[in-house]
From Swiss-Prot:
Membrane spanning residue stretches: 10-30, 53-73
HAMAP family to which the protein is assigned, alphabetical: ATP_synth_c_bact
A GO-annotated cellular component: proton-transporting two-sector ATPase complex, proton-transporting domain
Topology class, membrane: Multi-pass membrane protein
Molecular function as annotated in GO: lipid binding; proton-transporting ATP synthase activity, rotational mechanism
Entry coiled-coil feature ranges: none
Quaternary context: F-type ATPases have 2 components, F(1) - the catalytic core - and F(0) - the membrane proton channel. F(1) has five subunits: alpha(3), beta(3), gamma(1), delta(1), epsilon(1). F(0) has three main subunits: a(1), b(2) and c(10-14). The alpha and beta chains form an alternating ring which encloses part of the gamma chain. F(1) is attached to F(0) by a central stalk formed by the gamma and epsilon chains, while a peripheral stalk is formed by the delta and b chains.
Protein name (Swiss-Prot/TrEMBL): ATP synthase subunit c
Family affiliation: Belongs to the ATPase C chain family.
Gene Ontology biological-process entries: proton motive force-driven ATP synthesis
Alphabetical UniProt keywords: ATP synthesis, Cell inner membrane, Cell membrane, CF(0), Hydrogen ion transport, Ion transport, Lipid-binding, Membrane, Transmembrane, Transmembrane helix, Transport
Encoding gene (name): atpE
Subcellular location: Cell inner membrane
Length: 85
């Protein structure tokens, strides 16, 4: 049982860590492309900004879903019940 709990802790750490890393890379690329587009066509900034914030919200949503799944595995681990039962 300790092995399952330990491996679950490692999986949770990877889930949160890699999710945060992916979001950080995504935000970096998104911000860079937004600034590039704004410098190229300044009249398009309001439309680009709206689209940037929509995509930023979707990037955050993916990370928050990962955090929710990680919290589920941390506090209501379904794998421990399968071994004990």
């Amino acid at each position: 049982m300790e092995t399952v709990v330990g491996l679950t802790a490692i999986a949770v750490a990877l889930l949160i860590g890699l999710g945060a890393l992916g979001t950080a890379i995504g935000f970096g690329l998104l911000g860079g492309k937004f600034l590039e587009g704004a410098a190229r066509q300044p009249e398009m900034v309001p439309m680009l900004q709206v689209k940037m914030f929509i995509v930023a919200g979707l990037l955050d949503a993916v990370t928050m879903i990962g955090v929710g799944i990680a919290l589920f595995f941390t506090f209501a681990n379904p794998f421990v019940g399968q071994i004990a039962g």
